UniProtKB/Swiss-Prot annotation:
Protein name: Heat stress transcription factor A-2a
Sequence ranges of Acidic residues compositional bias: 352-362
Modifications the protein undergoes after translation, according to the UniProt entry: Exhibits temperature-dependent phosphorylation.
Ranges in a coiled coil: 182-229
Region Disordered: start-end pairs: 137-168, 296-319, 332-362
Entries under SMART domains matching the protein: HSF
Disulfide bonds: none
Subunit composition and interactions: Homotrimer.
Upregulation: Not induced by heat stress.
Length: 376
């Protein structure tokens, strides 16, 4: 006979006797309660299913401080981040999951309701996957594929509730990480504003440069058109060229006459003084010799004595005329003034005929006119 069965029977008899005695009032209720408490009971959670092995292994690898450089908990502790996906797939996946496919790991996370929190990095979260609360892993259930047949109203309501549960988890994660997201967006906004300001300044500078270039191009085109019109008129109408020559000669003649009058007034007094010195009259050559001997100063303050040259045809006289004719003229007409001074001095000393001009003078006038129309 099995002794265990006998013991059970004895316990049952003792329990029955104690219950009968308690009912008759012979035994105390405390003894009957002690007998009830001594009965064997099953362990708590013995029949409940534990969390899936995938979740347990994922929790272990995330909670391991030695792998924080590759994978670790998020800032709020309600998510985990894979910092180095290549190292995670090459080292940790073969160690814990017997494969090295990171995409397969991500798909398996999706089947358990994990959602990606940050689109810029591998950060996943679930409402039952929290730091320091491993017992909540049993609340994470694997999602079942939707049935192929059209579901009834009750099944559709249950499936909608099941689909809304991960969304609530994502909302919860968003509430925890809202401050970080706002700070990152503010930094991105400030960077974009600085770039926009810089591009706007560069645009304004480029626009100003383009306007200045357009003005220079328009001015050059206008001068080119004027030069083309001038050349066309000069080629078609020879009288137009002669008119320009006469006008320029008249302008130079007027300036030369003014300078000649001023020079004659300045030189008249020394010459008259020499001619009437000591109450005697002398010839032009003798007066020049006396002027050189006495060292009479020139009108412009030059004390250099003049050489002999009846009519003022010497080299010093020519340079003196050239300096006087060049005074007051603009820089672009300096060559014309010098040429006019030389021509005036030659006409006063050697009586050269000013009416004899050759073809070279016409060419010079044409070149000077083109020079005045050319861009500076």
């Amino acid at each position: 006979m099995n002794p265990l069965r006998v013991i059970v029977k004895e316990e049952e008899l003792d329990f029955a006797a104690a219950a009968a005695a308690a009912a008759a009032g012979e035994g105390s209720p405390s003894s009957w309660a002690v007998g009830v408490m001594d009965l064997p009971r099953p362990m708590e959670g013995l029949g409940e299913a534990g969390p899936p092995p995938f979740l347990c292994k994922t929790y272990e690898v995330v909670d391991d401080p030695g792998t924080d450089t590759v994978i670790s908990w998020g800032f709020a502790g309600n998510s985990f981040v894979v910092w180095d996906a290549n190292a995670f797939a090459a080292v940790l996946l073969p160690r814990y999951f017997k494969h090295s496919n990171f995409s397969s790991f991500v798909r398996q996370l999706n089947t358990y309701g994990f959602r990606k929190v940050d689109p810029d990095r591998w950060e996943f979260a679930n409402e039952g996957f929290l730091r320091g609360k491993k017992e909540l892993l049993k609340t994470i259930k694997r999602r079942r594929p939707p049935p192929s047949s059209p579901p009834s109203s009750s099944s559709s309501s249950s499936s909608s509730q099941h689909q809304q549960q991960p969304a609530a988890a994502c909302l919860e994660v968003g509430q925890f990480g809202r401050d970080g997201v706002v700070n990152r967006l503010q930094r991105d906004k400030s960077v974009l504003i600085a770039e926009v300001v810089k591009l706007r300044q560069e645009q304004q500078t480029t626009r100003a440069q383009m306007q200045a270039m357009e003005e220079r191009i328009s001015a050059a085109e206008q001068k080119q058109q004027q030069m083309t019109v001038f050349l066309a008129r000069a080629m078609k109408n020879p009288g137009f060229l002669q008119m320009l020559v006469d006008r320029q000669a008249g302008q130079h003649g007027a300036r030369n006459r003014v300078l000649e009058d001023a020079l004659s007034k300045k030189r008249r007094r020394p010459i008259e003084y020499l001619l009437t010195r000591n109450g005697e009259t002398c010839a032009a050559g003798e007066s020049a010799a006396m002027l050189a001997a006495d060292g009479v100063a020139e009108p412009d303050g030059d004390t250099t004595p003049r050489g002999d040259g009846g009519g003022g045809g010497g080299g010093d006289t020519e340079s003196f005329w050239m300096q006087l004719l060049s005074l007051g003229l603009e820089e672009k007409q300096r060559e014309d003034g010098v040429a006019g001074g030389v021509q005036e001095s030659n006409s006063g000393g050697a009586d050269v005929d000013n009416d004899e001009e050759d073809d070279d003078d016409d060419v010079d006038v044409l070149v000077q006119s083109i020079y005045h129309l050319s861009p500076k």
